[in-house]
Amino acid sequence: MSQPYDYIEMKIPAKPEYVGVIRLTASGIAGRMGFSYDEIEDLKIAVSEACTNAAQHAYKSKDKGEVSIGYSLYKDRLEIIVADRGVSFDLQELRKKIGPYDQQKESIEYMREGGLGLYLIETLMDEVKFHHNEGVTVLMTKYLEGEKVESGAKTISP
């Protein structure tokens, strides 16, 4: 696997009011890399959902922990990692619990809560991996259409 040409890492308190900072960062990075407007919007929604899930579900105490966000910039893709050290969950068990929504059998007013954010992340990103050994780590990948990387852009790495 190739090495990223730049890596950016941020840590935020696991509080919903900081998710906007991560959205803006994702938008700025994706724009610089050459993603389209629609792709940037997809990235913003996916990273927001992952961070919001961590802020709402990872830590049970009032002294909330933190969420780490890593952006790996490659020539052909952007990988975003959102990780917490809070309560883990089993994705397969959650999917069994919430099950698919069937509009023929269920009214929208009584739709089960939970899982929509995970569905959005998987739908909007090209690749998604969940790890739940220590806390939860979400690895999301969005590929560029062709070579849209800004040529001659100044980066941190040589």
Language model: regions and residue ranges:
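A general secondary-structure boundary signal
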Residues: 27, 48, 126-127
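Conserved beta-strand-loop-beta-strand hairpin that lines the nucleotide-binding pocket
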Residues: 1-9, 55-158
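Conserved ATP-binding N-box helix of the HATPase_c
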Residues: 37-62
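Bergerat-fold GHKL ATPase/HATPase_c domain
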Residues: 1-45, 150-158
